[in-house]
Amino acid sequence: MSDPRERIPPGNSGEETIGEAFDWLDRTVEEINRAAVNHLPRELIFQVWRRSWEYWHDEMGMSVSYTKYRYLCLIQKAMFMHCKKGCRCLGGEHGAGGWRPGPPPPPPPGLA
């Protein structure tokens, strides 16, 4: 008889699909963007998004999902550092920040 402590927890059966992982990644990117806009300048978020695509996707030839994952890691790190330094935002938006000349970069998911 097997030990009941050895059972696989619900939701971790290995039956999840790659499609579900991609859906999770898309949802998570949108959610962190909605949260990040309350703590980080929009220009920073947009530039990290744009540079992630330029570097990881265009220059390095990585997949769309890998590019989104790398962007997610960078924004999570930025949010962590912001909160670690003592967030005093209280839910207020920072606004656009210092926009560079020319049209703004395309917004990341969740900020369109």
Curated annotation (Swiss-Prot):
It comes from the Viruses. One of its GO terms (cellular component) is host cell nucleus. The keyword Ion transport does not apply. It is found in: Virion; Host nucleus. Transmembrane segments: none annotated. GO terms for molecular function: metal ion binding. A motif (Nuclear localization signal) lies at residues 65-72. Keywords: Host nucleus, Host-virus interaction, Inhibition of host innate immune response by virus, Metal-binding, Viral immunoevasion, Virion, Zinc. The keyword ATP-binding does not apply. Belongs to the lentivirus VPX protein family. Plays a role in nuclear translocation of the viral pre-integration complex (PIC), thus is required for the virus to infect non-dividing cells. Targets specific host proteins for degradation by the 26S proteasome. Acts by associating with the cellular CUL4A-DDB1 E3 ligase complex through direct interaction with host VPRPB/DCAF-1. This change in the E3 ligase substrate specificity results in the degradation of host SAMHD1. In turn, SAMHD1 depletion allows viral replication in host myeloid cells by preventing SAMHD1-mediated hydrolysis of intracellular dNTPs necessary for reverse transcription. This is Protein Vpx. The lineage of its organism: Viruses, Riboviria, Pararnavirae, Artverviricota, Revtraviricetes. The gene is vpx.
